[in-house]
């Protein structure tokens, strides 16, 4: 009786599975139902857990186990091994709490667990069990009843039996499935986030490299542009210095004498004035040079167009005369048709004279004039008013010419002029004539247009004779309107030879106003 009580109170833990047999259900106890072998129990839900003699060996059994594993994976949402692990964990946690399996069910759980871990029962390798070890004998008997059941079938039977004993297994597995799905979603989201961050990082890196390359290219282009501009500036500065040196060598004496007259005894002011005059002379020279280049280009283009239009219809002799008559010469920095030079196409009478007497001596090259301005217009006009002969009135529509013969002891002519309130046209010409009178004279004419109209009324023969007797005339400074009412206009020119300078004050464009001109001319050696 004592042995029976000890057995009834026995509670054994085998491989993590606790076995606590009840007195009512233990085999051999009074009032307990007879134990039936698990393999012959109908409707126990084990299916493939029967003895190996009832299974068909070979490929049919393997295919059946694989098919069962696929069905369970589809139903539970986990692979067979993962599902078995969840079921085993659920059994260990919930046994005796959420459900209370019977003694036979516990033996079945232990046997299936052993079948999964160790495979079929082998009496040669299993330790001996004592005669009084009731649980050990029951466990060995249950394990041996599984026969050659495969590991997969044992896991399937374990899950089925546990689900039959405790329906909460479905909720437990479902919660883990949801957790697994959430974890998978989080994993995918994290992977996508890392991928996006990596792509964004690569994109930003590429953009940064692109911006860096563009910046380097831009800096290189800017540096090249700055270098080119600096080289161009140095070249222009060097060219300017060369041109100014050449111009200053021509005008050094005139500017020095002019500055000495303006600021006698004040060397510093003289040097300042000379530098201003040299700079103005350079600017004027460059402006005239650009005008000459533009005029030459326009003349060449016009000549080319005329030759193309008229070349096909003119005979050979006419072509030669036309080409000779359209040649232009650059005199004093201005492009003009030299109608009175020995290089022009001669009139018939002049041609006969050249054949009989031979060609005339060629005229010397005329130097370019120097012109500048200075702002002391009020002091200049007050000084000029002291000499009444130095103030002339040019009436509306008139052209006043001041004739200044060259002086035997002089080599440069200087002029200065200003007006009261309005501008006036001004130009300088040189007449190749030996004037016996060295005094300055003033001549008034209505306008140059009237002279041209008078010349149109005479015949060609009379015009040719008149031109033959007329002295040669060269333009030094073309007639342009000057703002001499705002500042004093001054200039100088080197004598090209013996002759007469013609200073023209042109008011022919004014229909209503007369102009008062304050002027002064003098020569230097």
UniProtKB/Swiss-Prot annotation:
Q: Which organism is it from?
A: Mus musculus
Q: What is this protein called?
A: Golgi resident protein GCP60
Give the N-acetylalanine positions (modified residues): 2
Keywords in UniProt for this one? Acetylation, Coiled coil, Golgi apparatus, Lipid biosynthesis, Lipid metabolism, Membrane, Mitochondrion, Phosphoprotein, Steroid biosynthesis
- The region called Q domain is annotated at 238-305
Q: Coiled-coil stretches, from where to where?
A: 169-254, 448-470
**How does the protein's chain sit in the membrane according to the entry?**
Peripheral membrane protein
**According to its UniProt entry, what is the function of this protein?**
Involved in the maintenance of Golgi structure by interacting with giantin, affecting protein transport between the endoplasmic reticulum and Golgi. Involved in hormone-induced steroid biosynthesis in testicular Leydig cells. Recruits PI4KB to the Golgi apparatus membrane; enhances the enzyme activity of PI4KB activity via its membrane recruitment thereby increasing the local concentration of the substrate in the vicinity of the kinase.
Main subcellular location: Golgi
Q: Where is this region: Disordered?
A: 12-68, 180-226, 319-346
Q: Where in the cell is it found?
A: Golgi apparatus membrane; Mitochondrion
Q: What Gene Ontology cellular component terms go with this record? A: Golgi membrane; mitochondrion
GO MF terms listed in the record are: fatty-acyl-CoA binding
Q: Which SUPFAM superfamilies match?
A: Acyl-CoA binding protein, Supernatant protein factor (SPF), C-terminal domain
- Phosphothreonine PTM positions read 18
Give the Basic and acidic residues compositional bias ranges: 337-346
rRNA-binding keyword on record: no
Q: In which tissues is it expressed?
A: Expressed in brain (hippocampus, olfactory bulb, neuronal and glial cells of the cortex), eye, submaxillary gland, testis (interstitial and tubular compartments), ovary (granulosa cells, theca cells at late stages and primary follicles), adrenal gland (fasciculata and glomerulosa cells), heart, liver, and steroidogenic cell lines.
**Which residues, renumbered to this chain, carry the PTM Phosphoserine?**
13, 20, 40
Q: Where is the composition biased (Polar residues)?
A: 319-336
Q: Where is the ACB domain?
A: 80-171
Ranges for domain GOLD come to 381-523
Where are stretches of biased composition, namely Low complexity?
Answer: 52-64
**Keyword presence, Acetylation:** yes
- Kindly state the subunit structure of this protein: Homodimer. Interacts with the C-terminal cytoplasmic domain of giantin/GOLGB1. Interacts with PBR and PKA regulatory subunit RI-alpha. Does not interact with PKA regulatory subunit RI-beta nor PKA regulatory subunit RII-alpha. Interacts (via Q domain) with PI4KB (via N-terminus). Interacts (via Q domain) with TBC1D22A and TBC1D22B; interactions with PI4KB and with TBC1D22A and TBC1D22B are mutually exclusive. Interacts with C10ORF76 and RAB11B.
Gene Ontology terms describing biological process: steroid biosynthetic process
